[in-house]
């Protein structure tokens, strides 16, 4: 039961930190970006980038629009 309390307390602390104006841990940053297939699906100052997983474990990967400089 103490492990459950620990998880709940940590979750509440993270939630409080995220709600402080000007402070963000970017926990939801990727989900706020829209998905894309090519750079044409993104704004002019964004690029379509493959995110998620790593070399040893590809896991779940998706393409999202992130800020970049395209010329």
UniProtKB/Swiss-Prot annotation:
Disulfide bonds join 36-48, 42-65, 47-68. GO terms for cellular component: extracellular region. Residues 1-20 form the signal peptide. Expressed by the venom duct. Keywords: Cleavage on pair of basic residues, Disulfide bond, Knottin, Neurotoxin, Secreted, Signal, Toxin. It is found in: Secreted. Residues 21-29 form a propeptide. Elicits an uncoordinated twisting syndrome when injected into C.elegans, but has no effect on mice. The presence of a 'disulfide through disulfide knot' structurally defines this protein as a knottin. The cysteine framework is VI/VII (C-C-CC-C-C). This is Augerpeptide-s7a. It comes from Terebra subulata (Chocolate spotted auger).
